[in-house]
Regions:
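Hydrophobic h-region of N-terminal signal peptides that target proteins for export
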Residues: 5-17
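N-terminal hydrophobic targeting signals that begin at the initiator methionine
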Residues: 1-2
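Structural scaffold elements adjacent to functional motifs in cytosolic proteins
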Residues: 35-37
Length: 131
């Protein structure tokens, strides 16, 4: 009986978490889904950003982070039940952050695999970052 209950709990938890893994493509930028760029300001300046995206740094240049600060800014942009996408340089940081947001906090997250570098490689023209 305990095994059945444990199995049901795991299944229910998996169903609640809504994490999608999608390749970052120029076509994705045309969708009507908010894109949150979690890179650093230096990275935003270096490559530019996706047009219409929102910039909220998660990890700073030294790898430090503040979940509270990030969530405060995120919650000003998206509703808890609203689907949104995360992008970083190549998808490593967003892989970790999107999994955390989805599995621990039940956000509806799309991880843009390959990041901004994949989009640029496929011909996407970023816009300059303005503070």
């Amino acid at each position: 009986m305990k095994k059945i209950l444990f199995g049901l709990l795991i299944t229910a938890t998996a169903l609640m978490a809504e994490l999608q893994q999608v390749w970052a493509t120029p076509q994705f930028a045309d969708k009507n889904i908010k894109i949150i760029d979690i890179r650093t300001p230096a990275e935003w300046k270096e490559t530019g950003i996706v047009k219409g995206s929102y910039t909220i740094m998660f990890f700073d240049e030294k790898g430090n982070f503040s979940v509270e600060s990030f969530l405060r800014q995120l919650n000003m942009l998206v509703k808890k039940d609203e689907q949104f996408a995360l992008i970083c340089r190549v998808g490593s940081r967003t892989g970790m952050v999107s999994e955390f947001l989805s599995e621990k906090l039940n956000y509806k997250v799309i991880n843009l695999k390959g990041g901004i570098m994949k989009m640029i490689h496929e011909g996407y023209k970023t816009v300059p970052y303005k503070q």
